[in-house]
Amino acid sequence: MVKEVVLGIDLGTSAIKIIAVDQLGNVIESVSETLKLYQEHPGYSEQDPNEWFEATKKGIKELIQSTEMSDKIVKGISFSGQMHGLVIVDDNGIPLRKAILWNDTRNSIQCRQIEDIYGERLNYNPILEGFTLPKMLWVQQHEPEIWNRVDVFMLPKDYLRYCLTQTIHMEYSDACSTLLFNPENYEWTKDVGDTFNIGDIYPPLVKSHSYVGNVTSSLAKELGLSSDVAVYAGGGDNACGAIGAGVIHDKSALCSIGTSGVVLNVEYQRVTSYDSNLHLFNHSVPDTYYAMGVTLAAGYSLNWLKQTFFENESFEEILNLAASSKIGANGLLFTPYLAGERTPHGDAQIRGSFIGISGQHTKADFARAVIEGITYSLYDSIKIMRRAGHEMNSITSIGGGAKSRFWLQLQADIFNVQIKRLKHEEGPSMGAAILAAYGLGWFKTIESCVEAFIKVDEVFEPNNENHDLYEQYYSVYEAIYKQTKQLTADLLTITN
């Protein structure tokens, strides 16, 4: 019997998920611990780093004490984590304030300050509220008494890993989301930090599969772990999500629909000619990049639909109802800009719209319009990638969009590409587990580990006739942003 396991820990926004995986890729046990989100003012989004650690300890204890783990030995741990979030600590490693998260949009002024010096892109990425550098500038300008005590900055999973090992590192796939890292030469661009008087607060850089220490002996005893559990750096949630979905080769792509939506395209050669708000990041697979587009309110839009119109229906019932409407929702379009939009517009102020409402529209049409609108927004990113010359042989769909055969076929038809669904989907936590398995030497390459662990369950082929019809609706969808940009800005001014 296989007794050795690794733990993959995914620090998300709403929860921490921990899985135990054996050498055959079987998930032996899985636990999840919910997290509190602090949103004290409009545009603010924070979490307490100490609560991440307490939730992780609780989850590991539950997992270790489960019946399924009674004869298992944890040999390694690695991490996946929500990207961009700013954690600042003093010289004792104690957080100086709550972490400012990826979806915090208070720093628009700081983004403009960076643009005034560097233009619209910095280190191959657009300058947007989600990134780490603008968050630093906000703290520096609004909380100088805190900023003056900063010894080092970290990203969320890096702080959590520090709590387990008492060693401080940051790896490439997360560092590239700060605007302070050059993804081409794998170095901090300290001259950028010097421009804004950031100071020497940079953590040491390592690869995603790098060994960074062991769980401290006192913590190992508290958690019920052996004293020799090796810890590996891990990766950003999107890089780990891609690894956990088997998306590691050129011309392979990932569509992930959670609270936000992501389209990620793997590149062996970095492409810098993108004409819009795509991100270019380092993959957790060595010497590999990925381009990424983000829909800020993907699953969030579906949650809003349920809470507002379908409080008593399940998501499955909502999707079945949507499937009963025709392609194009009988002439009803929805833009999922409930929290602004990242790709392609980079606009924190834009708001969503229903366009084309008539007295003939039903709840089924509204449900389908929301599903199609989310998918059109993801298609925006795919269009940009294709214009830059990147082909996609297939897209693996994970998250909420992979739980419905109707939505999977809709993705295939709109994107006009083969869509794959996984046999077992564990998301970024599986990617973290794979990094630990590779780091331990269970496999000679990440590729061989992925091949052993990840299996495809079903493939959806595009319907050309449906795609042609969706293209007509999409051409109208594309025009809505420019037509409503000023209108929604005016409404925000009045409302605020």
UniProtKB/Swiss-Prot annotation:
It holds the Pfam family FGGY_C. Signal peptide: none annotated. The record marks D10 as: Important for activity. Coiled coil: none annotated. PROSITE patterns: FGGY_KINASES_1, FGGY_KINASES_2. InterPro entries: ATPase_NBD, Carb_kinase_FGGY, Carb_kinase_FGGY_CS, FGGY_C, FGGY_Carb_Kinase, FGGY_N, Xylulokinase. Belongs to the FGGY kinase family. Catalyzes the phosphorylation of D-xylulose to D-xylulose 5-phosphate. PANTHER family: SUGAR KINASE (PTHR43095), XYLULOSE KINASE (PTHR43095:SF5). This is Xylulose kinase. It comes from Staphylococcus epidermidis (strain ATCC 12228 / FDA PCI 1200).
